[in-house]
């Protein structure tokens, strides 16, 4: 049998309501030289019947007899893949028709890039467009404090996946984030600066138990990156960076600790050159401005936080402070206009 250009790996567990739409979005791609590998992680609903209902020779169905988790299922699907490229897809999302054609064209034109993702448009519980950084050096920097890739948008080269697995033994939930970090330090990674997938937001996506596991594993990846940059890592620094990553780990941001950490990260990078200095500085400026502007209760507190750490001062932060200071004047002017 002729090997396809792209192998799409779709892992499913109890998604009977959404699976058909996800599969149809892949089988309807403008690039049709593909195979769709379904790895059913011991579903107990009608997902197996839905998967088998597609009369398309490009569909290959595999089933785990017991629930092994997403990382193990993903590794199984990749092991079965025969394509030159391997695309990831979730069982509740919708790939736009030209997604694979666009991504293959990008990787063909950029042979040094190991993988690429793209922007997503959410639907369901709420709607927004998630625009991620797209240049390789920016992605490498942003992985320090975020996950700037959406897993169901990823297209990888087979050569990238051949020597790696998704760390299923160490990471049950944050395996994708750990994988992107590993790859980014060896090969360039990228995003297409356009929407390639509709990402469904619904209540059944993640349980509280799974969320706790995800945060614990994310902390492990954050610690590893901090140790690589600073030469050491401690619980307080990891907790501060975790707050920046998820913005929900604590009710109030530990601004002094975060500011101190950002200053040490910037200084360490100037010595070690782990990241492009200008790009790291820009990312830290953005994060610091967002935290100070979002959590300082008053203009005076914003100025106090900004001025106490001159090493983190930026034009962006100065503009945010001025806007906050002018807010009462704007409110008074509008009130006078309506009087």
Model-derived segments and spans:
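Cell-envelope/extracellular polymer assembly enzymes that use nucleotide-activated donors
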Residues: 4-7, 35, 178
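A conserved hydrophobic helix/loop-capping motif in glycosyltransferases and polysaccharide synthases
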Residues: 6-18, 22, 29-30, 39
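A conserved acidic beta->alpha catalytic loop
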Residues: 25, 32, 40-49, 66, ...
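Glycine-rich, basic loop-to-helix element that forms the pyrophosphate-binding segment
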Residues: 64-81, 102
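Conserved nucleotide-sugar donor-binding catalytic segment
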Residues: 79, 133-224, 228-245
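Short aromatic/hydrophobic "clamp" motif used to bind/position activated sugar donors
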Residues: 86
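Conserved donor NDP-sugar-binding/catalytic core segment of glycosyltransferases
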Residues: 98-130
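C-terminal subregions of glycosyltransferases and related glycan-biosynthesis enzymes
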Residues: 201-339
